[in-house]
Amino acid sequence: MRLAAIILVGGASARMGADKALLCWNGRRAVDRLADLARTVGAEHILTVGHGDHGLPRLDDPSPDGGPVAGIAAGVAALKAKGYGRVLVLAVDAPTVRPEDLSPLIATVPPGAAYEGLNLPLVMDIDASPSDAGPGWAVRRLVERAGLARLACPAGATERLRGANTPEERHRLLTALLQAETAA
């Protein structure tokens, strides 16, 4: 089954005070780090959903105030039309996620999975996406209605997977990223 990735780049970034997609993380924009990550784990196509042109294939969020599921639903419809069968959904506020953090999700059997206590990232078979999913839905509801498994989060990965919504959270993640990439 062909895998594509959606990177959610919407949201007002009010708590962060800057567009999270454009923030630099050790010299690279968040959106670029995530696009490379998605390719590394096998995504054949990357689609950003939200606002702004980030130099990648994009889809404007048809309901910018409708929450992440509105963007996921729009992206899933676009990817289904292109013949993709499975989607990895990433949030732009989590650019320090590592390939090994995603491996358990990628390896799941249909219809896909998300981690316990986190709604993103997730992997979902496109045909499992509820046809009525859209604005106002919580991601948790999408996960439940799609029948996605809940997996234990890999040890030490929770903070990376949760991402950064404030400058303080970004500072903690950036410090850890710099230490990890310097040691590598």
Named regions from a protein language model:
Residues 1-118, 126-131, 135-137, 144-157:
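Nucleotide and nucleotide-moiety/phosphate-recognizing core
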